[in-house]
A protein has these predicted regions:
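N-terminal, positively charged/glycine-rich alpha-helical extensions of SAM-dependent methyltransferases
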Residues: 17-48, 193, 204
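C-terminal alpha-helical "lid/dimerization" subdomain adjacent to the S-adenosyl-L-methionine
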Residues: 36, 176, 180-230, 234, ...
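Conserved alpha-helix/loop element of class I SAM-dependent methyltransferases that forms part
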Residues: 48, 57-77
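Class I SAM-dependent methyltransferase SAM/SAH-binding core
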Residues: 79-133
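A short acidic, Gly/Pro-enriched loop at the edge of an enzyme's catalytic core
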Residues: 132-144
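A short SAM/SAH-binding and catalytic strip from SAM-dependent methyltransferases
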Residues: 142-156
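A short glycine-rich, Lys/Arg-flanked "PGG" loop and its adjoining helix->strand segment in the class I
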Residues: 157-172
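Core SAM-dependent methyltransferase catalytic element
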Residues: 237, 243-263
Length: 263
């Protein structure tokens, strides 16, 4: 079974040579087909998830999260949701004066987030939820953040629409996500993202499937201008993307359009 799993992941990695439209279809098919497996996978690697982010980000993810917190603080939100919160780092890095919530579909991830919060000045409210069906009223939130989770949405368009639904008009959305590096260092950076996490995963746990999946999900995710277009189509205005660390990650920002506002 492990050999078959590795073969599937390898096929997805090779798909980086396909046209972007095909890449998007491959990614969506992979996530939809394996959603229960993906939830279980995140549960299995929860105790190593922070280390994985250190590796994928070349150690830069803490600084990236501070950039997200600065964007959110500038907007001065009263009610903030960190969707796909994982082990809670992004939620815990927000201004303690706001009403902060963090949700994730992985219970082991949330357990680690709660444990971290015990030693933090920020005390978010945690709850388990699928980001496609958030138990939140329409327009209830001033801001939503998503860190390293949007590429795992089962249905990207439906997920973005759900984030727009729970935001008030002119509410802020900030997304931090890995992206495809470009420029002179791009080949070396892509090699790192594809090869190093699976290798370390194998050495640490003997199970590299999850790490291969996460590397593949970065390679097939519609980043940059394409994701900005999808955000605009979902009802966000003023959408912009800022690349970080040579394009290893990208910070996306947008506000939910007022009713009747032209997008």
């Amino acid at each position: 079974m492990r050999k078959r799993a590795r073969k599937r992941a390898g096929e997805i990695l090779v798909s980086r040579y396909l046209p972007r439209a095909t890449l998007a279809a491959v990614r969506e098919a992979l996530v939809a087909k394996r959603k229960p497996e993906i939830r279980g996978m995140f549960g299995r690697i929860a105790h190593r998830y922070d280390l994985l982010n250190r590796m994928l980000s070349l150690g830069c993810d803490r600084g990236w999260r501070r950039a997200v917190a600065a964007r959110v603080a500038a907007a001065g939100p009263g009610r903030l949701l960190d969707a796909c919160t994982g082990t809670g780092d992004l939620a815990l890095g927000q201004d303690a004066g706001a009403a902060i919530y963090g949700c994730d579909f992985s219970l082991p991830m949330l357990a680690l987030a709660r444990a971290k919060a015990a030693a933090s000045a920020t005390r978010p409210g945690w709850f388990a939820a699928d980001v496609l069906r958030l138990p939140v009223a329409d327009g209830a939130l001033d801001a939503v953040t998503v860190g390293f989770g949007i590429r795992n949405f089962e249905d990207l368009e439906a997920g973005l629409a759900e984030l727009a639904r729970v935001l008030r008009p002119r509410g802020l959305l900030v997304i931090l996500e890995f992206s495809t590096p470009r420029g002179r260092l791009a080949p070396a950076l892509r090699w790192w993202v594809r090869r190093v996490p699976p290798l370390v995963g194998r050495l640490l746990s003997g199970d590299d499937e999850a790490y291969r999946y996460l590397a593949a999900s970065v390679a097939t995710f519609p980043d940059g201008g394409e994701l900005c277009s999808r955000l605009a189509a979902a009802g966000f205005t003023g959408v912009r993307a800022t690349t970080l660390t040579g394009g290893v990650a990208t910070l996306y920002e947008g506000t939910r359009a007022d009713d009747g506002e032209e997008r």
